[in-house]
């Protein structure tokens, strides 16, 4: 179920979600290297360096989880919070809970179950470590330095020089050498030149105006051009940064693309036709399967309806079971109380102190009964005496009344 839910989440997030862990792991490894984790953690713990995809792929869950806990504790302490180094015998759930508490204290949200961290790999593990590393960089006020660009060495193209080809630099050097060698031979008298020029101008001005005609022989001119032409060739060194080179390359690439497009267009059209035919076959096959399985689909729907009804009845029965379970719990609690009272009474009955008290009470009761018997006897005796005394008095009174009657009768 967990794999299915994970695949469903990846489908919702897009096709690139499966590779997010690899990107986060690469960023995390760069940050750990900036924090010198190799010297402060690996050498002290005698561990191997992490690979580029250590926490992105499952290798050894126990080792990965221990490395995750070790790096988390080191980063938390380096960020300014106190956190004990986890040990191998510690409870993993408690360790994960403490790590997530520290993550929340830094202001990060935790929207995944803690069991994802218990595996020791995955996007959540990389996320937690990346957050801690980011907090450490903020705590130490890490700042990036300006990049230093290496000096690019221009590739000097070797130019093959023929006897008929000259470079600009060589031409300039030769011209400078000729000027320096012939400085003494080519002095010009400016005054004489100016006088000669004025004389020629005067002669030309004196001549009547006429049409100028060329006296040059065409054949000799062509021969001279062919003789001088090889020496006039100049090789210009190409610069890779020249925009003309880039334009030529663009034209070449465009021509190559056009050529490749002409070749591949036929294959693409053929592939398009094959895909269209395959889709048509799939759609027809799908219709055929739907027609064949229509009865089974209806049976499946009826089975689904029966299943939903059974689930509803089960929920109702579960509600009654829950109520009876609650009543049973109450009765069990009362039974436990009665058992406890019985145990207390049984323990008190086995004790000898109440028996002694009962014997003392019986003895006292017997003594009181004896006293009551004595008092009863005294009362009966007193009552008997009073009765006898009253009876004697009545007898005497009766005798006293009978004597006058007898005397009256005698007379």
UniProtKB/Swiss-Prot annotation:
Q: Where do the segments described as pDED lie?
A: 317-408
Question: What is any one GO biological process for this UniProt entry?
Answer: regulation of apoptotic process
Report the domain of life of the source organism: Eukaryota
Q: Which of UniProt's keywords are assigned here?
A: Apoptosis, Cell projection, Cilium, Coiled coil, Cytoplasm, Cytoskeleton
GO CC terms in record: ciliary basal body; cilium; Golgi apparatus; intraciliary transport particle B; microtubule organizing center
Q: Which residues form a coiled coil?
A: 261-351
Q: Can you tell me which family this protein belongs to?
A: Belongs to the IFT57 family.
What's the protein called, per UniProt? Answer: Intraflagellar transport protein 57 homolog
| Species assigned in the record | Xenopus laevis (African clawed frog)
Q: What is the lineage of its organism?
A: Eukaryota, Metazoa, Chordata, Craniata, Vertebrata
Give the encoding gene's name.
Answer: ift57
